[in-house]
């Protein structure tokens, strides 16, 4: 029986009935080196109390098999108590001891205990990833965040392996029957939730140092450890990672006025990781994509630093104080997202951190918040499947954006003081929104419920704007602030905004700031609001060539530049602005205009072409390079795209030629050139040159000119681009795959083979995706990403089979793997297929088939329906923009 989807009501009933004291967990990884073994033994003893003796509950365990279950000394009959992913526990006593012996699966999906065999040297690596509910794939437990406990881990594994967990290692004892095996015993953990327990095992490279605090608030020296695969050791810049970690610990301990609450700080960079990182206390895990084998730009380093600080903030927000249920996931993720950027800027001096936040994180939030499945920051999470889908742009980026608005609303010092009180009051416990609001009310001296109602418990994004009213003499008489509230906003409820307006003059092609002043939108739901201005402000606003609303990016709202605001001045002078954040806000506004079919893609691409060689910020340059390609692929008219891609290729190539050797710009632009070559008519020789350098130990003209070494990452990107255009043979791909076996090679090969634009390869890729459940998460993703390249006509025959297979995929795969397939294979028919003259967006095959499936499957799992609804909405937006751009093309 598939009963894995624990409901909120079931969790509440269980936490009202029991409290958990300790888990004693033994995991035996003796057989992990042998790929023939698909499972490993576990033994778990749980001590818990029940406030209603005689009652019953259940414990969670997604298992390979169960050997025995003993409750309070009584052996239970397996066929009577084991029911799918649950084990029924009846006739409970006031104090209970439960012991379960079983076997758990090694994972290939990144959920549970993931096992990886390194193709470059055969070494074995294991790590766990649980959030929100995959700890039960490793050992039996009460899988919900408010049943915290102390964990005692014992891990049996090869003696020469690295083995770690949340707590410090107490002892290591050699197996008397096999001196190549030993058992590691770890100290008891603090009282933590199941989803942040962790195990690491394998032949990892280990770097160590000791953190000696400079902060006033601290708990003394802390051992620091960093892990990675042995084959990545030459690229592992652990000194930088340690420096960021030390800076972060100094910063956050003083900021929160609370010492780091755990005895060690370890960070493992692991393969085939599904997410960016996970805040397991004492043993944080990261994707090994943060080990930069092809060199690192400032933007790359900033991104990793942000993630390190994000996870570190979780040691307080999330680990020390944890949400009661996943409804309040924002209580940790929104705060950590905000603190990650703050830590990158203030503790580690990445000056563009808030620029990246504005252009990347908030763009994610705006996109997510306009979907039909958007939800309040404080979400309604009825069950675990819903929880798994809510690690999204609302919970993370919108939540962090709203916290930034909160800081502007109550002041930074008040916000931080509230956090300090919150940690001390609720340490080692669980909380909800009301607990946080109570503290915020006390510290701020204000009733914050209205603010919470407006920002945390509503969904959708407001659209802000300005209108200038002039008198007959040509002088400004009024400045009107406009606000379009989301359609789903409750009647009578507005949104208070604290923002800034900056005025600019365009002089000799340069935008010069002439003034900036604060504005407050009223809390009432008004669509227009007249601003009281001084005479000087009236003059500045009236004469401005550009009005930048939400200057400094304090509030959360779409600000679409219009001709009245100075759209043309913004496009003409964006590169002349001194402030990277101001430039970023203009690029962000232009991007939203493209998505909303208000700005032609040709205009956006032309702006990128004219400014790409002038942008000094690595963060903004990367966004420009990436978004310009997405704009063409997703929103432009299907005819004429090659011309736009070629224009980008020429612009990137010219900018690369004048970029400083060894600069960030060089690497960003070279990556962009390879990517554009996937769709342009140009770039074949560049990609062949890179492939030769990567796989034949030669260098070519481009390598000689830039000094950038051609490694496997760049090589497989180049081969993937060539494969998409049918400019490389299967034999060439096979030869490259054997040059230097590695994860990069195997995934690059899977992508390139699936990208080849012929019916045979698309059929093989589709079958592999749907039928081969042995694929790892990364291999599946690479195959999907290659499959969707090339002419849409090669995939049309799979539109119907895709929808027919959805329920089966959801039932047979883990939620992570199923989600990859559902999102990745969703059909993306362009507007001119099925949407010719006289036909609407809903007549497009992709949209129509999705609608038919949704109507035919009203009882399908809500998480699956959400994925289909979101994909359908992305399709609708894409088709509307394509039609808009095609209509301009026809004029």
Question: Where are the model-predicted features located?
Answer:
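Small/polar loops that bind or transfer phosphate-bearing groups
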Residues: 61, 308, 753
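Charged, low-complexity, helix-prone segments enriched in Lys/Glu/Asp/Gln
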Residues: 14-27, 150-151, 238, 343-347, ...
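Short glycine-rich loop/turn motifs
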Residues: 85, 281-282, 374, 715-719
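Non-catalytic accessory/interaction domains
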Residues: 2, 129, 154-157, 163, ...
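General secondary-structure propensity
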Residues: 24-33, 322, 730-736
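Short, mixed-charge, low-aromatic patches
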Residues: 110, 196-203, 260-263, 292-299, ...
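Hydrophobic alpha-helical and helix-loop surface patches within well-folded domains
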Residues: 186, 217-490, 623, 630, ...
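Acidic/His-enriched low-complexity segments
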Residues: 1-263, 289, 366-367, 391-397, ...
């Amino acid at each position: 029986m598939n009963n894995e989807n624990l409901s909120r009501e079931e969790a509440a009933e269980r936490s009202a009935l029991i409290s958990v004291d300790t888990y004693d967990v033994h995991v035996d990884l003796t057989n992990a080196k042998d790929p023939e073994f698909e499972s490993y033994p576990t033994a778990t003893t749980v001590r818990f109390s029940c406030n209603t003796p005689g009652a019953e509950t259940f414990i969670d365990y997604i298992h390979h098999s169960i050997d025995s279950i003993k409750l309070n000394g009584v052996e239970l009959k397996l066929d009577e108590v084991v029911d799918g992913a649950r084990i029924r526990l009846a006739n409970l006593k006031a104090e209970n001891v439960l012991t379960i012996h079983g076997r758990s699966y090694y994972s290939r999906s990144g959920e549970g205990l993931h096992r990886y065999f390194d193709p470059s040297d055969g070494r074995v690596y294991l790590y766990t990833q649980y959030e929100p509910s995959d700890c039960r794939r490793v050992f039996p437990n009460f899988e919900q965040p408010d049943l915290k406990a102390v964990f005692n881990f014992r891990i049996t594994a090869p003696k020469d392996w690295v083995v770690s967990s949340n707590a410090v290692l107490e002892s290591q004892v050699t197996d008397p029957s096999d001196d190549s095996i030993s058992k590691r015993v770890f100290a008891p953990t603090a009282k933590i939730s199941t989803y942040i327990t962790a195990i690491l095992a394998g032949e990892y490279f280990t770097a160590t140092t000791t953190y000696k605090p400079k902060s006033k608030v601290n708990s003394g020296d802390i051992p620091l450890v960093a892990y990675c695969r042995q084959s990545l050791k030459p690229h592992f810049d652990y000194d930088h990672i340690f420096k960021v970690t030390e800076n972060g610990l100094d910063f956050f301990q003083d900021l929160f006025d609370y010492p780091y609450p755990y005895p060690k700080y370890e960070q493992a960079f692991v393969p085939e990781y599904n997410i960016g990182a996970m805040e397991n206390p004492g043993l944080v895990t990261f994707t090994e994509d943060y080990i930069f084998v092809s060199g690192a730009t400032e933007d790359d380093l900033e991104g990793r630093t942000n993630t390190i600080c994000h996870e570190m903030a979780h040691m307080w927000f999330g680990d020390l104080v944890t949400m009661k249920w996943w409804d309040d996931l924002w209580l940790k993720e929104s705060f950590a997202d905000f603190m990650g950027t703050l830590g990158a800027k203030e503790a580690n001096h990445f000056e563009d951190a808030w620029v990246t936040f504005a252009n990347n994180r908030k763009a994610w939030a705006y996109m997510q918040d306009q979907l039909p499945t958007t939800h309040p920051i404080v979400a309604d999470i009825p069950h675990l499947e819903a929880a798994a889908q809510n690690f999204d742009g609302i919970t993370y980026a919108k939540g962090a954006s709203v916290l930034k608005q909160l800081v502007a609303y109550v002041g930074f010092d008040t916000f931080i003081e509230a956090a300090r009180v919150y940690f001390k009051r609720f340490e080692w416990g669980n909380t909800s929104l009301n607990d946080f609001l109570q503290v915020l009310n006390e510290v701020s001296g204000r009733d914050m419920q209205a603010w919470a109602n407006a920002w945390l418990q509503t969904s959708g994004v407001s659209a802000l704007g300005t209108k200038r009213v002039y008198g007959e003499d040509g002088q400004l008489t009024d400045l009107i602030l406009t606000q379009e509230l989301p359609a789903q906003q409750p009647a009578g409820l507005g949104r208070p905004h604290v923002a800034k307006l900056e005025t600019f003059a365009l002089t000799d092609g340069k935008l010069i700031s002439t003034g900036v002043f604060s504005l407050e939108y009223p809390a009432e739901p008004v669509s227009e609001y007249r601003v009281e201005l001084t005479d000087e402000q009236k003059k500045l606003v009236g004469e401005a060539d550009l009005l930048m609303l939400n200057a400094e990016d304090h509030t959360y709202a779409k600000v679409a530049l219009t001709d009245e605001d100075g759209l043309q001045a913004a496009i003409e002078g964006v590169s002349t602005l001194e402030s990277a954040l101001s430039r970023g806000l203009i690029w962000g506004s232009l991007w939203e205009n493209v998505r909303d079919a208000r700005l032609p893609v040709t205009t956006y691409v032309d702006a990128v072409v004219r400014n790409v060689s002038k942008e000094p910020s690595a963060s903004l340059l990367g966004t420009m390079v990436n978004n310009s390609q997405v704009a063409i692929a997703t929103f432009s008219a299907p005819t004429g795209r090659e011309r736009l891609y070629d224009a980008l290729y020429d612009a990137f190539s010219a900018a690369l030629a004048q970029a400083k050797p060894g600069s960030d710009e060089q690497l960003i632009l070279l990556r962009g050139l390879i990517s554009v070559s996937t769709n342009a008519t140009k770039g074949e020789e560049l990609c062949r040159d890179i492939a030769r350098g990567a796989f034949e130990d030669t260098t070519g003209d481009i390598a000689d000119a830039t000094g950038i070494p051609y490694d496997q990452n760049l090589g497989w990107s180049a081969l993937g681009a060539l494969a998409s255009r049918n400019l490389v043979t299967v034999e060439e791909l096979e030869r490259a795959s054997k040059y230097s076996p590695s994860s990069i090679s195997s995934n690059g090969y899977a992508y390139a083979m699936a990208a080849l634009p012929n019916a045979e390869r698309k059929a093989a890729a589709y079958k592999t995706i749907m039928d081969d459940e042995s694929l790892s998460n990364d291999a599946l993703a690479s195959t999907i990403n290659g499959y969707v390249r090339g002419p849409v006509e090669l995939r049309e025959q799979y539109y119907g089979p895709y929808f027919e297979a959805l329920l089966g995929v959801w039932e047979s795969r883990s939620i992570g793997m199923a989600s990859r397939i559902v999102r990745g294979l969703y059909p993306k028919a362009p507007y001119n297929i099925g949407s010719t003259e006289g036909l609407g967006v809903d007549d497009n095959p992709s949209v129509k088939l999705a609608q038919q499936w949704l109507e035919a499957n009203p009882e399908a799992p809500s998480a699956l329906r959400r994925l289909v609804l979101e994909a359908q909405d992305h399709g609708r937006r894409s088709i509307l923009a394509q039609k808009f751009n095609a209509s301009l093309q026809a004029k």
